[in-house]
Every structure is written in structure tokens, then in C-alpha cells.
Curated annotation (Swiss-Prot):
ATP binds at residues 61-68. The gene is lpxK. PANTHER family: TETRAACYLDISACCHARIDE 4'-KINASE, TETRAACYLDISACCHARIDE 4'-KINASE, MITOCHONDRIAL-RELATED. The lineage of its organism: Bacteria, Pseudomonadati, Pseudomonadota, Gammaproteobacteria, Lysobacterales. Keywords: ATP-binding, Kinase, Lipid A biosynthesis, Lipid biosynthesis, Lipid metabolism, Nucleotide-binding, Transferase. This is Tetraacyldisaccharide 4'-kinase. It catalyses: a lipid A disaccharide + ATP = a lipid IVA + ADP + H(+). GO terms for cellular component: plasma membrane. Belongs to the LpxK family. The keyword Lipid biosynthesis applies. Its EC number is 2.7.1.130.
Amino acid sequence: MSKRGTRTPGYWYDNTPIPLPARILAPVYGAAIALRRALYRRGWRRRHGVPVPVIVVGNVTAGGTGKTPLTIALVAKLQEAGWTPGVASRGYGRDDAGTARWVEADTPVALGGDEPVLIAWKTGARVRVDSDRLAAARALVEAGCDIVICDDGLQHYRLARDVEIEVVDGQRRYGNGRLLPAGPLREPAARAQDCDFRVVNLGQASATATPQAPDDAGFGKWQMRLSIDSVQPMDGKRAQPLSMLAGQRVHAVAGIAHPERFFAMLRARGIGVVPHAFADHHVYRAADFSFGSRLPVLMTEKDAVKCRPFADEWLYSVPLKAELPAAFWVSLLDRLNKLASRQGV
């Protein structure tokens, strides 16, 4: 696992000049992905399925857009509806990326990847990491799962899917609109129009706003908002309301794709934030928290799973909940029930 994590090039989302090598490589990359997709669409490369419904949660941009909170919410909703979901993931950033394995809540992040460990910890669902998503899906079915969620698998065309959910960041959107490496796009933005559900992550939920389906102007249909209302001491003590920190200063740590979003959510709750942004998927050491002042340290749960080995009474994780409109869940579950009846699940 990279000790530094990954950082987003500034020119993807601002007016910074794009380096010449990136501009040269982008058309080459674009031709390669267009050819690859055409091979699958025309049947020259076979897609392979499993005998249960498959949901792919992904994005057409590189980097984080809110897929993990949505995946966690999706697993919880399916469990509530009587399904036994399993999650297939590549396990980005783990040390032995070529090894397939089951991920449990206590699996070391170096072996399972931060997001799969977080999903297992939050949901208790079966989680399988494998660079081959098809093999992961088959393993989940053999383990008794009656529905598979493929986390970040939109471009993994070898695995046949029944439902595609695109997630896009409501602030960054599709950046400069260019393909990798000149921009953030893994595929042309028009690819998102093929997805069954398009979710736009609008960030912080307000006390009065209810997620809804806005007019679809080609950019997301279903609003997703993120809420925080508690803090979990990482030394094992009981969770406390986030409001207890209102008016206080804290160190806020975020090693995610868009750290400022987390910092803004804390500030909106009246908390004085001393921000510490790390690269996405950063591997923490105790020394990273030598801030020179003994203030509470708040971090995302994705960061927290990597800090458990050296957690003390000063470290807190902030649970984050994805909120979507009721109509989204009704529409999705209705489609899944029809699929299940056809497949005999």
C-alpha cells in the first residue's frame, strides 16, 4: 500500500494548464477504452454473469465521489428488505493486490483495503476482494449471498450486471471534461447516461432539506446528502453526540478524495476546525498525529479503520450516513424484486 496515498492533479478541476504529456496520452487512452467497450457491446468479448442480481456502484471519474457511503447504505437497505447482500471489491491500495481474500471487520487494512474493511465493519456483510470482480461475485454466491454489489466496478465489463448506479460529486462534477490523464474521466461523460440510476452527491444534509429527485438536466437524477451527528471515541467508549464539541477547537483529519467537504461539515456544526488533509488512501502512523496541541482529533471512518492499532482517548471517528429519497429505494427494490422473480432467487 502506498505510504503517501493518491492526490488529485489540480488541473483536473481548475484552469491550471494541462501538462503536454497528459494531453498527448489522453486520446490514446480514449481510443483504448472505446475499443474495449465496443468489443463487449458487440459480443466479441464475453460478459459472464452469476445466478443472482448484480448491482454495480461506480463512476465515470477517477477518485472518490461518495461510492462507499452509498454502498454501505445500499447494503443496509437490502438487509432490511430481507436480502443477503455481498460486496465485491478490488480492494484498492492493499499490499497484496493479486491475492483474493475475505475481508472481515478486523482484517488489517494492509490486507483488505480501507474501503472494504470499512464496509465489512459497518454492515457485517460478506466482503470479497479480488482484482477479478467476476471471481469475487462467484465466491459471494457460493458463500450464500443472494445479491452482489460490485463496488467501483462500472468499467469492469467482464462481469455482467443487472443494475448500474453512477455516483458523481455535486461540486466537482466531471471536472474539465477530459479523459485520463488530462482530466478525471475514466470514460466519456456521456457513458453516465447509460446507467440505470444516477446519483449526485450534494454533500452535507441540512436539518430541513429532504433528498429528492430534481429535474434531470443530464447531471445526476437522485440527490444524495451526507449527515453526521455523533462521534465515536476510538478507545472503545460509548458514542457521543457531535453537538458536545460545538464551540470547541479540534484537529480534523481526512485522507479522502475531497477533504474539505469533511472539514466544512464539521464547521457547519459549530466546531472550530484545525484542518489536516492527507492524500486519499494515506497509510497513517502515530507520528502523523503529532500536532503540537492536545485537542480532540476527529476523522472520517475511512481514516479511522487505519488508525485502530494506535488509537487513544484523543482520537474520534465521525460516522457518516448517506441519505437518499424514499422514491429511490422504492424504485431500486422494485426492480430487484422483478429480477429475482425472473432469476428464481
